[in-house]
A protein has these predicted regions:
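A conserved glycine-rich beta-strand in the N-terminal activation segment of trypsin-fold
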Residues: 136-210, 410-511
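Short, Gly/Ser/Thr-enriched beta-strand-loop segments that form substrate-interacting elements
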Residues: 122-136, 393-416
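Structural boundary/hinge residues at secondary-structure and domain interfaces
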Residues: 1-128, 132, 175-236, 241, ...
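Short, exposed beta-strand/loop patches in secreted or surface proteins that constitute
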Residues: 116-120, 138-141, 239-241, 384-389, ...
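C-terminal regions of mature proteins
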Residues: 522-559
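Extracellular or lumenal secretory-pathway regions
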Residues: 17, 168, 526-527
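Active/binding-pocket-proximal capping segment
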Residues: 364-396, 444-453
């Protein structure tokens, strides 16, 4: 119905599975060792949790094979605040499985003291389950090879009316919801590549409807217009599998009101071409860079907080708690020194440990601004900050105290962070790993193996330009999954991981399942997996309708 607040739909599940098998994930899943691993996990899981199939009254495989076409799950609300659930499954010729499933539902409801009746809604037969322990008793329709389950007679009548073609003008459908259609228009793909799955979520309408009569919740909701959050409309998107030239494409759209006010007025994104900085190595697994007009956002923040706290109160708090104690002016000395570009890169610090992935953040500064001197003065106030130099680059290393390690103790599975702060060119660079910092400075000084010069990044960047058309990017991302996948394989295959699972298997059935599976598992080689991998990227566009994200992964060049 029109007032649907949450929705997930797979247009055709068998086609979805077939297309998924053409993607990197599907091809990795077809690896002999991965298939053996998953088969072992499935068997061990069902052995550890026999109640699943006992409750279903059929093998899990049989239930999973039921959908033969569209699958849709939705949640809608009524004007009085009731929540209605909806499930649709095209089961095709799987009528025997459907009958078995409904037979088991009959048994469960009757065993609970409920009843099972058949009623006619217009010209359609509806199975009504009256469950005394659940107010949302299901109603089931079986028609034209399709199973529909609802939890509200209003929803049932709505479905039947549209199915029979007798719907009135008041019985509007979700396809008439302007928020939904606007989001889907931004997420439809091309004629050659239609979405295989789509989704939608409208949290404000859901909360507003379900908190009727709750004074505290309604009081909180009444604040939203004051801070501008009532301008958040909804979000949704789609997934396209194995379209021409790509592995996957995804769309996510956050719909925002025009004009933006309050909190939403802090989303003052700029634009840029996203060329990686000269200190970003080519072997980073992930790179994100975005543009945000901080000074404009800060002014809007002052306006917002003055509305909430009172005129001038925010500035008073900043003066008392920041400016005066540090002898600095937040607005003039820091905010105005930022050029509006922010970057995050990751790197895997060897050897493989649970937190081997480190991060580096770059904040671009305006040329000639005094922020550089102010920053160094503030860092020197930190007692555990040690000034160092590497490759003619000064930096500060934050010395985190660590307990002494006993002789003969095996290497820790946890990496001890070694934070660093530096001014590199016109950037503040912060990282949690000194090894990563030095690796980046090697790249910066040598000019070799830079991400900006890599063929993989150039390819992703060109596809981003193609996706943008006339638009401008406010944020771009780049990812190459090899090192992260290698880290996962190293951790999974580590004897200490197996020992941990074995030691805790008696206290957790699930850990016991993992212990049994991993104890005898043969892991695939990296070469077998990486031939199915290719770089991926995404872009964020800030326009008058809201924020739109386009993500994609490329088809791998195999063999």
């Amino acid at each position: 119905p029109y007032n649907t607040v949450a929705y997930f739909r797979i247009a055709n599940l068998p086609e979805f599975k077939a297309k998924l098998s053409e993607t990197s994930i599907g091809k990795i899943g077809n690896n002999e060792d991965i298939q053996s691993l998953m088969s072992s996990f499935y068997e061990e899981f069902l052995t550890a949790y026999p109640e699943i199939e006992e409750e279903l009254g059929m093998p899990l495989d049989e239930l999973l094979d039921l959908p033969q076409g569209e699958v849709c799950v939705a949640v809608a609300v009524t004007d009085t605040g009731s929540v209605m659930f909806f499930l649709l499954v095209d089961f095709g010729d799987r009528i025997a499985t459907t009958d078995k499933l409904l037979g088991r539902l009959d048994e469960l409801v009757l065993a609970a003291g409920g009843s099972v009746e058949k009623e006619m809604v217009s010209e359609t037969e509806v199975i009504v389950y009256d469950n005394p322990i659940d107010d949302n008793s299901p109603e089931v329709i079986i028609k034209d090879g399709t199973l529909v389950v609802t939890t509200n007679r209003l929803m049932t009548e709505h479905v039947v009316a549209h199915w029979e073609g007798t719907a009135t003008a008041e019985q509007r459908t979700f396809s008439q919801n302007r928020k939904f259609t606007a989001i889907m228009r931004s997420s439809v793909g091309t004629e050659e590549a239609r979405p295989h799955a789509s989704w939608y979520f409208d949290p404000l309408t859901l909360v507003t409807a379900t908190t009727q009569g709750n004074f505290a919740a309604q009081a909180a909701m009444a604040i939203l217009p004051t801070i501008g959050l009532d301008g958040f409309k909804a979000l949704g998107g789609s997934v396209i599998l194995a379209p021409p030239g790509f592995d996957t494409i995804s769309h996510t759209h956050i719909a925002l009101a025009v004009p933006r006010r309050g909190v939403l007025d802090l989303l003052t994104f700029g634009t840029g071409d996203g060329t990686p900085e000269p200190w970003v190595p080519a072997d980073v697994p992930a790179y994100i860079t975005g543009y945000w007009n901080v000074d404009e956002a800060y002014d809007n923040l002052i306006t917002l907080l003055d509305t909430v706290l009172g005129e001038g109160e925010f500035q008073t708090q900043v003066d008392e708690n920041f400016n005066l104690p540090l002898d600095i002016d937040l607005r003039e000395d820091i905010i105005e020194g930022m050029a509006g570009r922010f970057t995050l890169a990751t790197w895997v610090v060897p050897p493989a440990r649970i937190n081997s992935q480190s991060m580096m953040i770059g904040i671009e500064l305006k040329e000639g601004h005094q922020l550089t001197a102010d920053l160094e003065r503030l860092i020197e106030l930190i007692p555990i900050a040690e000034k160092k130099s590497y490759n003619n680059q000064d930096y500060y290393n934050i010395q985190i105290p660590t307990p002494p390690q006993q002789p003969g103790t095996p290497p820790s599975r946890i990496r001890i962070p070694s934070p660093c702060i530096a001014i590199v060119g016109n950037y503040i660079v912060l990282t949690d790993s000194e090894e990563f910092f030095q690796h980046a400075m090697d790249t910066n000084s040598s000019g070799n193996d830079r991400l900006a010069d890599s063929e993989e990044f150039a390819l992703i960047r060109q596809h981003i330009k193609n996706q943008l058309g006339e638009e401008q990017a406010s944020m771009i991302t780049f990812a190459q999954p090899r090192d992260q996948l290698q880290l996962v394989l190293d951790l999974v295959g580590d004897d200490r991981t197996k020992d941990f699972l074995a030691d805790n298997s008696e206290n957790s059935r699930f850990l016991g399942v993992l212990s049994n599976v991993m104890g005898n598992a043969k892991l695939p080689s990296m070469d077998d997996l990486t031939r199915h991998l290719a770089p991926s990227g995404s872009v964020m566009i800030n326009n008058e309708t809201g924020l739109h994200f386009i993500g994609f992964s490329l088809k791998p060049t195999e063999e």
